[in-house]
Amino acid sequence: MPSPTHLLNNFESSSSQGPPSYCLICCEVADGHHFGAAACRACAAFFRRTVQLNKVHDCPKNGQCFILSNVRNMCRACRYEKCLEVGMQRSSVQQKRDQLGRRDGLPTNREEPVLDTMRRAYEKLLVVRKKVHNRQENQLPRAISFNELQVVYQNEMTVIYQFLCEAFPEYSELLPDTKRSLFKNFFLPFTLLESSYYGYLTKQENVMLIPSGDYVDLAHLESYFNNNHHTFSQKDTISMFAQQFRMLHTSITVPLSAENVDVNEFLALAAIILWESDLEVEADRKNVQEEAVKIKSAIIKDLLFHYQSINVYADVAMRLGAVLSILPSIQRASHRFHEYMEIKNLLNLYALPKNLYDMFSPTS
Protein backbone atom coordinates (compact mmCIF):
# COMPACT_ATOMS: atom_id res chain seq x y z
CA MET A 1 0.00 0.00 0.00
CA PRO A 2 1.51 3.38 -0.97
CA SER A 3 2.47 5.68 1.88
CA PRO A 4 1.35 9.35 2.02
CA THR A 5 4.94 10.47 1.39
CA HIS A 6 5.24 8.24 -1.67
CA LEU A 7 1.94 9.51 -2.99
CA LEU A 8 2.83 13.18 -2.65
CA ASN A 9 6.26 12.78 -4.17
CA ASN A 10 4.80 10.93 -7.14
CA PHE A 11 1.64 12.95 -7.48
CA GLU A 12 0.56 13.31 -11.08
CA SER A 13 -1.30 16.12 -12.76
CA SER A 14 -4.98 15.58 -13.41
CA SER A 15 -4.48 16.56 -17.04
CA SER A 16 -5.79 13.94 -19.42
CA GLN A 17 -2.51 14.07 -21.32
CA GLY A 18 -0.41 13.66 -18.17
CA PRO A 19 2.63 15.73 -17.20
CA PRO A 20 5.86 15.76 -19.22
CA SER A 21 8.52 13.43 -17.89
CA TYR A 22 11.27 15.90 -17.00
CA CYS A 23 11.69 19.57 -16.27
CA LEU A 24 13.45 21.15 -19.26
CA ILE A 25 15.34 23.48 -16.93
CA CYS A 26 16.79 21.30 -14.15
CA CYS A 27 15.91 17.72 -15.25
CA GLU A 28 13.77 17.13 -12.15
CA VAL A 29 10.46 15.31 -12.63
CA ALA A 30 8.03 17.78 -14.23
CA ASP A 31 4.53 18.30 -12.91
CA GLY A 32 3.07 20.01 -15.98
CA HIS A 33 3.47 22.84 -18.49
CA HIS A 34 4.20 26.22 -16.91
CA PHE A 35 4.38 29.48 -18.85
CA GLY A 36 4.94 27.61 -22.11
CA ALA A 37 7.41 24.89 -21.12
CA ALA A 38 7.56 21.56 -19.31
CA ALA A 39 8.84 22.35 -15.83
CA CYS A 40 8.89 21.24 -12.23
CA ARG A 41 7.08 23.26 -9.60
CA ALA A 42 10.30 24.76 -8.21
CA CYS A 43 11.51 26.10 -11.56
CA ALA A 44 8.04 27.43 -12.38
CA ALA A 45 7.91 29.26 -9.05
CA PHE A 46 11.44 30.62 -9.59
CA PHE A 47 10.54 31.96 -13.04
CA ARG A 48 7.31 33.49 -11.76
CA ARG A 49 9.04 35.29 -8.87
CA THR A 50 11.83 36.54 -11.11
CA VAL A 51 9.36 38.03 -13.58
CA GLN A 52 6.92 39.43 -11.04
CA LEU A 53 9.64 41.12 -8.99
CA ASN A 54 11.70 42.16 -12.04
CA LYS A 55 14.78 40.59 -10.52
CA VAL A 56 18.13 40.83 -12.29
CA HIS A 57 20.63 38.06 -11.53
CA ASP A 58 24.37 38.05 -12.18
CA CYS A 59 26.41 34.98 -13.13
CA PRO A 60 29.94 34.69 -11.67
CA LYS A 61 30.96 32.24 -14.44
CA ASN A 62 29.89 34.14 -17.55
CA GLY A 63 26.82 32.01 -18.16
CA GLN A 64 28.57 28.63 -18.06
CA CYS A 65 26.91 27.13 -14.96
CA PHE A 66 25.30 23.69 -14.82
CA ILE A 67 21.58 23.80 -14.04
CA LEU A 68 20.58 20.48 -12.50
CA SER A 69 18.26 19.72 -9.60
CA ASN A 70 21.05 18.04 -7.61
CA VAL A 71 23.35 21.08 -7.84
CA ARG A 72 23.32 23.06 -4.63
CA ASN A 73 22.74 26.82 -4.92
CA MET A 74 22.03 26.82 -8.65
CA CYS A 75 23.11 30.00 -10.42
CA ARG A 76 19.97 32.12 -10.67
CA ALA A 77 21.13 33.98 -13.75
CA CYS A 78 21.79 30.78 -15.70
CA ARG A 79 18.61 29.20 -14.40
CA TYR A 80 16.57 32.15 -15.63
CA GLU A 81 18.28 32.14 -19.04
CA LYS A 82 17.56 28.44 -19.39
CA CYS A 83 13.90 29.10 -18.57
CA LEU A 84 13.79 31.49 -21.51
CA GLU A 85 15.73 29.12 -23.77
CA VAL A 86 13.27 26.27 -23.29
CA GLY A 87 10.30 28.48 -24.11
CA MET A 88 8.98 30.07 -20.93
CA GLN A 89 7.18 33.35 -21.69
CA ARG A 90 7.41 36.40 -19.46
CA SER A 91 4.10 37.62 -20.89
CA SER A 92 2.32 34.51 -19.60
CA VAL A 93 3.24 35.35 -16.02
CA GLN A 94 2.15 38.97 -16.22
CA GLN A 95 -1.05 38.21 -18.08
CA LYS A 96 -2.24 35.63 -15.59
CA ARG A 97 -1.34 37.73 -12.59
CA ASP A 98 -3.17 40.73 -14.04
CA GLN A 99 -6.28 38.62 -14.57
CA LEU A 100 -6.30 37.65 -10.91
CA GLY A 101 -5.69 41.14 -9.58
CA ARG A 102 -3.17 42.53 -7.15
CA ARG A 103 -2.41 40.95 -3.81
CA ASP A 104 -2.86 44.11 -1.79
CA GLY A 105 -3.41 43.36 1.86
CA LEU A 106 -1.22 40.28 2.12
CA PRO A 107 1.23 40.40 5.00
CA THR A 108 4.45 42.10 3.99
CA ASN A 109 6.55 39.21 5.34
CA ARG A 110 5.27 36.89 2.59
CA GLU A 111 7.69 36.44 -0.30
CA GLU A 112 5.74 33.75 -2.16
CA PRO A 113 2.13 32.67 -2.77
CA VAL A 114 0.33 31.14 0.20
CA LEU A 115 -0.15 27.77 -1.51
CA ASP A 116 3.56 27.54 -2.35
CA THR A 117 4.43 28.12 1.31
CA MET A 118 1.83 25.57 2.38
CA ARG A 119 3.14 22.92 0.02
CA ARG A 120 6.72 23.36 1.24
CA ALA A 121 5.49 23.15 4.83
CA TYR A 122 3.46 20.05 4.04
CA GLU A 123 6.39 18.32 2.39
CA LYS A 124 8.40 19.08 5.52
CA LEU A 125 5.56 17.69 7.64
CA LEU A 126 5.80 14.37 5.79
CA VAL A 127 9.53 14.18 6.52
CA VAL A 128 9.03 15.08 10.19
CA ARG A 129 6.33 12.43 10.51
CA LYS A 130 8.74 9.67 9.57
CA LYS A 131 10.96 10.64 12.50
CA VAL A 132 8.17 11.27 14.99
CA HIS A 133 6.50 7.93 14.25
CA ASN A 134 9.82 6.06 13.92
CA ARG A 135 9.09 5.13 10.33
CA GLN A 136 11.91 3.17 8.70
CA GLU A 137 12.72 3.32 5.00
CA ASN A 138 10.75 0.72 3.00
CA GLN A 139 8.76 -0.25 6.10
CA LEU A 140 5.51 -1.91 5.04
CA PRO A 141 2.19 -0.53 6.34
CA ARG A 142 0.35 -2.67 8.88
CA ALA A 143 -3.04 -2.77 10.57
CA ILE A 144 -2.91 -1.12 14.00
CA SER A 145 -5.03 -1.24 17.14
CA PHE A 146 -7.09 1.40 18.93
CA ASN A 147 -4.38 1.89 21.56
CA GLU A 148 -1.72 2.41 18.89
CA LEU A 149 -3.94 4.90 17.08
CA GLN A 150 -4.14 7.03 20.22
CA VAL A 151 -0.35 7.27 20.36
CA VAL A 152 -0.18 8.28 16.70
CA TYR A 153 -2.59 11.18 17.11
CA GLN A 154 -1.06 12.36 20.37
CA ASN A 155 2.22 12.67 18.48
CA GLU A 156 0.40 14.35 15.60
CA MET A 157 -0.55 17.34 17.75
CA THR A 158 3.03 18.61 17.72
CA VAL A 159 3.56 17.73 14.05
CA ILE A 160 0.45 19.58 12.85
CA TYR A 161 1.11 22.58 15.09
CA GLN A 162 4.59 22.87 13.58
CA PHE A 163 3.06 22.60 10.09
CA LEU A 164 0.70 25.51 10.78
CA CYS A 165 3.54 27.69 12.04
CA GLU A 166 5.60 26.87 8.94
CA ALA A 167 2.70 27.35 6.52
CA PHE A 168 1.31 30.55 8.03
CA PRO A 169 3.64 33.17 9.54
CA GLU A 170 0.43 34.93 10.57
CA TYR A 171 -0.51 31.99 12.79
CA SER A 172 2.83 32.09 14.60
CA GLU A 173 2.24 35.72 15.57
CA LEU A 174 -1.14 35.17 17.22
CA LEU A 175 -1.75 35.18 20.96
CA PRO A 176 -1.26 31.74 22.59
CA ASP A 177 -4.96 31.36 23.46
CA THR A 178 -5.95 32.34 19.93
CA LYS A 179 -3.56 29.82 18.41
CA ARG A 180 -4.95 27.11 20.66
CA SER A 181 -8.54 27.97 19.73
CA LEU A 182 -7.80 27.87 15.98
CA PHE A 183 -5.81 24.67 16.38
CA LYS A 184 -8.61 22.88 18.23
CA ASN A 185 -11.11 23.81 15.52
CA PHE A 186 -8.66 22.68 12.82
CA PHE A 187 -7.26 19.43 14.22
CA LEU A 188 -10.24 17.11 13.76
CA PRO A 189 -11.43 18.37 10.33
CA PHE A 190 -7.88 18.29 8.98
CA THR A 191 -7.30 14.79 10.34
CA LEU A 192 -10.47 13.53 8.63
CA LEU A 193 -9.75 15.43 5.41
CA GLU A 194 -6.18 14.15 5.15
CA SER A 195 -7.11 10.54 5.84
CA SER A 196 -9.92 10.74 3.27
CA TYR A 197 -7.61 12.39 0.74
CA TYR A 198 -5.11 9.54 0.86
CA GLY A 199 -7.95 7.03 0.88
CA TYR A 200 -9.17 8.52 -2.38
CA LEU A 201 -5.68 8.59 -3.91
CA THR A 202 -5.03 4.94 -3.09
CA LYS A 203 -8.62 3.89 -3.89
CA GLN A 204 -8.72 1.97 -0.59
CA GLU A 205 -12.29 1.55 0.67
CA ASN A 206 -11.70 -0.96 3.47
CA VAL A 207 -8.89 0.81 5.27
CA MET A 208 -8.47 4.14 7.02
CA LEU A 209 -4.99 5.48 6.37
CA ILE A 210 -3.32 7.23 9.29
CA PRO A 211 -0.37 9.66 9.46
CA SER A 212 2.18 7.11 10.70
CA GLY A 213 1.93 5.26 7.37
CA ASP A 214 -0.13 2.41 8.85
CA TYR A 215 -3.88 1.88 8.67
CA VAL A 216 -7.03 0.74 10.43
CA ASP A 217 -8.36 -2.41 8.79
CA LEU A 218 -12.09 -1.72 8.45
CA ALA A 219 -12.77 -5.21 7.12
CA HIS A 220 -11.35 -6.79 10.29
CA LEU A 221 -12.17 -4.39 13.11
CA GLU A 222 -11.86 -7.16 15.68
CA SER A 223 -8.07 -6.72 15.37
CA TYR A 224 -8.50 -2.98 16.03
CA PHE A 225 -10.23 -3.65 19.36
CA ASN A 226 -7.65 -5.80 21.06
CA ASN A 227 -8.50 -5.22 24.72
CA ASN A 228 -11.50 -5.86 26.96
CA HIS A 229 -12.00 -2.38 28.44
CA HIS A 230 -15.51 -1.79 27.17
CA THR A 231 -19.08 -2.37 28.29
CA PHE A 232 -20.62 -3.43 24.98
CA SER A 233 -20.20 -6.69 23.15
CA GLN A 234 -17.51 -6.72 20.50
CA LYS A 235 -20.20 -7.11 17.83
CA ASP A 236 -22.02 -3.95 18.96
CA THR A 237 -18.76 -2.06 19.24
CA ILE A 238 -17.66 -3.01 15.74
CA SER A 239 -21.07 -2.05 14.36
CA MET A 240 -20.84 1.43 15.88
CA PHE A 241 -17.33 2.06 14.61
CA ALA A 242 -18.12 0.68 11.16
CA GLN A 243 -20.99 3.15 10.90
CA GLN A 244 -18.62 5.95 11.85
CA PHE A 245 -16.08 5.04 9.18
CA ARG A 246 -18.77 4.60 6.51
CA MET A 247 -20.01 8.09 7.28
CA LEU A 248 -16.49 9.43 6.84
CA HIS A 249 -16.07 7.67 3.49
CA THR A 250 -19.41 8.89 2.15
CA SER A 251 -19.06 12.46 3.42
CA ILE A 252 -15.48 13.24 2.43
CA THR A 253 -13.71 10.51 0.44
CA VAL A 254 -16.46 10.18 -2.17
CA PRO A 255 -16.64 13.94 -2.95
CA LEU A 256 -12.84 14.19 -3.14
CA SER A 257 -12.78 11.28 -5.55
CA ALA A 258 -15.69 12.60 -7.61
CA GLU A 259 -13.87 15.90 -8.18
CA ASN A 260 -10.42 14.28 -8.58
CA VAL A 261 -8.99 16.80 -6.10
CA ASP A 262 -5.27 17.51 -6.49
CA VAL A 263 -2.72 18.33 -3.80
CA ASN A 264 -3.04 22.12 -4.22
CA GLU A 265 -6.80 21.88 -3.80
CA PHE A 266 -6.38 19.61 -0.76
CA LEU A 267 -4.10 22.19 0.86
CA ALA A 268 -6.44 25.04 -0.06
CA LEU A 269 -9.32 23.23 1.66
CA ALA A 270 -7.15 22.75 4.74
CA ALA A 271 -6.23 26.45 4.80
CA ILE A 272 -9.83 27.59 4.55
CA ILE A 273 -10.84 25.21 7.35
CA LEU A 274 -8.21 26.83 9.59
CA TRP A 275 -9.12 30.43 8.85
CA GLU A 276 -12.89 29.96 8.80
CA SER A 277 -13.15 28.59 12.32
CA ASP A 278 -14.77 30.66 15.07
CA LEU A 279 -12.78 31.93 18.02
CA GLU A 280 -13.49 31.66 21.72
CA VAL A 281 -10.90 34.42 22.38
CA GLU A 282 -12.91 37.64 22.17
CA ALA A 283 -9.92 39.98 22.63
CA ASP A 284 -8.25 38.86 19.40
CA ARG A 285 -11.35 38.11 17.33
CA LYS A 286 -11.41 41.23 15.12
CA ASN A 287 -7.72 41.10 14.21
CA VAL A 288 -7.88 37.41 13.34
CA GLN A 289 -11.02 37.83 11.27
CA GLU A 290 -9.40 40.59 9.24
CA GLU A 291 -6.29 38.48 8.68
CA ALA A 292 -8.41 35.46 7.80
CA VAL A 293 -10.21 37.39 5.05
CA LYS A 294 -6.86 38.35 3.49
CA ILE A 295 -5.49 34.82 3.63
CA LYS A 296 -8.63 33.17 2.25
CA SER A 297 -8.71 35.72 -0.57
CA ALA A 298 -5.06 34.94 -1.36
CA ILE A 299 -5.81 31.20 -1.33
CA ILE A 300 -8.61 31.66 -3.88
CA LYS A 301 -6.33 33.70 -6.14
CA ASP A 302 -3.61 31.09 -5.83
CA LEU A 303 -6.05 28.35 -6.82
CA LEU A 304 -7.26 30.31 -9.85
CA PHE A 305 -3.67 30.90 -10.87
CA HIS A 306 -2.97 27.18 -10.44
CA TYR A 307 -5.90 26.32 -12.71
CA GLN A 308 -4.71 28.73 -15.37
CA SER A 309 -1.17 27.37 -15.14
CA ILE A 310 -2.17 23.73 -15.67
CA ASN A 311 -4.76 24.72 -18.31
CA VAL A 312 -7.00 21.70 -17.70
CA TYR A 313 -10.40 23.21 -16.87
CA ALA A 314 -12.45 25.11 -19.44
CA ASP A 315 -14.29 26.99 -16.68
CA VAL A 316 -11.98 27.66 -13.73
CA ALA A 317 -14.70 29.42 -11.73
CA MET A 318 -16.90 26.34 -11.96
CA ARG A 319 -13.99 24.14 -10.92
CA LEU A 320 -13.28 26.39 -7.94
CA GLY A 321 -16.92 26.24 -6.89
CA ALA A 322 -16.97 22.44 -7.14
CA VAL A 323 -13.92 22.12 -4.88
CA LEU A 324 -15.15 24.63 -2.30
CA SER A 325 -18.52 22.87 -2.17
CA ILE A 326 -16.75 19.99 -0.37
CA LEU A 327 -16.12 22.17 2.70
CA PRO A 328 -19.61 21.82 4.24
CA SER A 329 -19.34 18.03 3.95
CA ILE A 330 -16.04 18.09 5.85
CA GLN A 331 -17.52 20.21 8.62
CA ARG A 332 -20.64 18.04 8.91
CA ALA A 333 -18.50 14.91 9.08
CA SER A 334 -16.38 16.53 11.81
CA HIS A 335 -19.47 17.33 13.89
CA ARG A 336 -20.78 13.79 13.45
CA PHE A 337 -17.40 12.34 14.37
CA HIS A 338 -17.35 14.43 17.53
CA GLU A 339 -20.85 13.25 18.42
CA TYR A 340 -19.61 9.65 18.14
CA MET A 341 -16.73 10.50 20.48
CA GLU A 342 -19.10 11.96 23.07
CA ILE A 343 -21.29 8.86 22.98
CA LYS A 344 -18.26 6.59 23.39
CA ASN A 345 -17.02 8.68 26.30
CA LEU A 346 -20.38 8.51 28.05
CA LEU A 347 -20.50 4.75 27.61
CA ASN A 348 -16.82 4.34 28.49
CA LEU A 349 -16.53 2.64 25.13
CA TYR A 350 -12.93 2.94 23.96
CA ALA A 351 -12.84 6.52 25.23
CA LEU A 352 -9.90 8.72 24.26
CA PRO A 353 -7.42 10.15 26.80
CA LYS A 354 -8.54 13.58 28.02
CA ASN A 355 -5.86 15.58 26.20
CA LEU A 356 -6.67 13.91 22.89
CA TYR A 357 -10.42 14.13 23.46
CA ASP A 358 -10.10 17.86 24.18
CA MET A 359 -8.04 18.40 21.04
CA PHE A 360 -10.62 16.58 18.92
CA SER A 361 -13.37 18.75 20.45
CA PRO A 362 -14.10 22.04 18.66
CA THR A 363 -14.32 25.24 20.70
CA SER A 364 -17.45 26.40 18.92
UniProtKB/Swiss-Prot annotation:
One of its GO terms (biological process) is regulation of transcription by RNA polymerase II. The keyword Nucleus applies. A zinc finger (NR C4-type) spans 23-43, 59-83. It is found in: Nucleus. Pfam families: Hormone_recep, zf-C4. The keyword Zinc-finger applies. InterPro entries: NHR-like_dom_sf, Nucl_hrmn_rcpt_lig-bd, Znf_hrmn_rcpt, Znf_NHR/GATA. GO terms for molecular function: DNA-binding transcription factor activity; sequence-specific DNA binding; zinc ion binding. Belongs to the nuclear hormone receptor family. This is Nuclear hormone receptor family member nhr-53. It comes from Caenorhabditis elegans.
